[in-house]
Amino acid sequence: MTTLTAQQIACVYAWLAQLFSRELDDEQLTQIASAQMAEWFSLLKSEPPLTAAVNELENCVATLTVRDDARLELAADFCGLFLMTDKQAALPYASAYKQDEQEIKRLLVEAGMETSGNFNEPADHLAIYLELLSHLHFSLGEGTVPARRIDSLRQKTLTALWQWLPEFVARCHQYDSFGFYAALSQLLLVLVEGDHQNR
């Protein structure tokens, strides 16, 4: 990633964490189709590796605005993809892909963080990885902790996430018939890949 700042990347990770952590409510649905969001998407598309993924997401958002009962339909998609059994789903947990579910706990401890009691999901949930990456990118921009230490932890987190993210994304594409969460996961995959290469 060359044109996006550390804070902008942090915001993308935080936004994706929110969208993968719970179903969209009416306010989020309105916001995702807003002019402000269109400006944000335009900024993201200025980063060439993200362009195709953002275009795909924008197409889904445009289709979403004319979908009957969009919020209820997206809630059903969310539930079917992320809350059911793994037979025809894309469970958002490292352990669902035979990865060490304790790794994220070690990374959180190293970052001086812990999971919130308000988030009733296991610590190896995708949203926790994304919140940690968001925190680390914000920390890079603040300059209060040595950049080398933050960058080392960022690379460890990206490596741990990359162990299972491609399979998660493939499952989103396979089982999300409408495509909104598949498009979100594709944007995440490209973002993580670019972030991982930006050492």
UniProtKB/Swiss-Prot annotation:
Q: Where in the cell is it found?
A: Cytoplasm
* Domain of life of the organism encoding this protein: Bacteria
Instruction: List, alphabetically, the GO terms of the cellular component aspect.
Output: cytoplasm
What are the top taxonomic ranks of the organism?
A: Bacteria, Pseudomonadati, Pseudomonadota, Gammaproteobacteria, Enterobacterales
- Family annotation (Pfam families): Nitrate_red_del
Listed GO biological process terms: protein complex oligomerization; protein folding
Q: What is this protein called?
A: Chaperone protein TorD
UniProt similarity note:
Belongs to the TorD/DmsD family. TorD subfamily.
Sorted alphabetically, the keyword list is: Chaperone, Cytoplasm
* Role: Involved in the biogenesis of TorA. Acts on TorA before the insertion of the molybdenum cofactor and, as a result, probably favors a conformation of the apoenzyme that is competent for acquiring the cofactor.
